Design a protein with these regions (language model features):
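Accessory alpha-helical/coil subdomains and C-terminal extensions
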Residues: 11, 16-20, 36-44, 156-241, ...
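Short, small-residue-biased leader/transition segments that mark boundaries at the very start
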Residues: 1-4
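ATP/NTP phosphate-donor binding region
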Residues: 8-77, 253, 257, 273
Length: 338
């Protein structure tokens, strides 16, 4: 590994370990998270001041809203005595966690950098050693905010998406520039630091949110059934710019029924890049008129977690619409909201 710069060794950091592939060890039933932060740090160069918390040892497929709240609380506690935080985390739900922490820890004044690996750090060829090393560097040199450091890239947390199952460059920055990269033992910034307001922490959420991906022929009855399941908000991955069926199987009318029952519907696209908008085509006119909320250029992960976070504040439909359109942490380009 490359030597760590003087700037890194001067900073006091804190690692919060949550499990994931990076911490996995063999077991009779397959790989399972077993290493804590202290063991993980043995695989990266020394010379830095790092405290650590072993929060839990979980496969990230099991990370749920309760764990997001625990992580946020751990960050708030560690923030009192450090200048940067690294969270080791499984890759499968890392983008959801990074998005939710971006909302919960809005305008945090220190960097919170999530990282993990595609292969366990105990393997000689693991990407975990490089990723953890790079995350430590990033957490030492970034400004406040929530980020993912993976491979050489550093990505804004609420703009990251896992796009590959096994490749080492597993994450991409969607509809937003990469924040920077780690090279030669230092962080290289690609963007100017954003102006920050006073740190605002809000961890109360309503997890009763459903994500529905439309396919040609999706039953309207299925869409309408979410109301009977106690769901309080729906994110719909529609076709292209936001198209839905409006004849034979009328998705638009079914979603309107949900809205009429005070269940907010957020419309996003199955396309990974560029913004969705229900304002372009005739097929979505029913939704436009009924108050569907456009996700604009948000990622699906950001739209889902933001809706949970907004519903933690309010269930008033007008306020939900206003908050979903507001840019809290760089998750949405307000100019793209139709």
């Amino acid at each position: 590994a490359l030597p760590i710069s003087e700037a890194v060794t001067m900073k006091k950091l804190h690692i919060i370990a949550t499990g994931g592939t990076i911490a996995c060890v063999p077991s009779p039933n397959g790989l399972m998270p077993g290493l804590g932060a202290k063991e993980l740090l043995e695989y990266v160069p020394g010379g830095h001041k790092i405290e650590y918390t072993d929060l839990f040892h979980m496969d990230s497929s099991n990370i749920q809203p309760e764990e997001w709240q625990q992580m946020a609380k751990a960050v708030i506690k560690a923030r009192e005595s450090c200048s940067g935080i690294v969270i080791t985390h499984g890759t499968d739900t890392m983008a959801y966690t990074a998005s939710m922490l971006s909302f919960m820890l809005r305008d945090i004044d220190i960097p919170v950098v999530l990282t993990g690996s595609q292969y366990p750090i105990v393997r000689p060829d693991s990407d975990g050693r490089k990723n953890l090393h790079n995350a430590i560097i990033a957490a030492s040199e970034l400004t406040g905010g929530v980020y993912i450091a993976f491979g050489d890239a550093v990505i804004k947390g609420c703009r990251a998406v896992k796009t590959r199952t096994t490749s080492l460059n597993a994450f991409e920055s969607i509809n937003y520039p990469y924040i920077g990269a780690v090279a030669n033992g230092g962080f290289i910034s690609f963007v100017r630091p954003e102006p920050r307001k006073e740190f605002s922490c809000f961890i109360d959420i309503d997890p009763r949110v459903a994500l529905i991906k439309l396919i040609p022929g999706t039953s309207p009855a299925f869409l309408e059934s979410v109301a009977s399941c106690g769901i309080k908000g729906v994110v719909v991955e529609a076709f292209g710019l936001g198209g839905v069926h409006n004849f034979r199987r009328d998705h638009a009318m079914s979603l309107k029924k949900l809205i009429d029952e005070d269940i907010p519907v957020v419309l996003t696209s199955q396309c990974l890049y560029e913004a969705s908008s229900p304002d372009i085509y005739e097929v979505s006119h029913t939704l436009r008129d009924s108050g569907v909320i456009s996700a604009a250029d948000m990622t699906t992960e950001a739209a889902v977690t933001k809706l949970m976070w907004v519903l933690g504040h309010t269930h008033d439909m007008d306020k939900v619409r206003q908050m979903m359109a507001w840019d809290y942490c760089g998750e949405i380009n307000a100019d793209r909201v139709m």
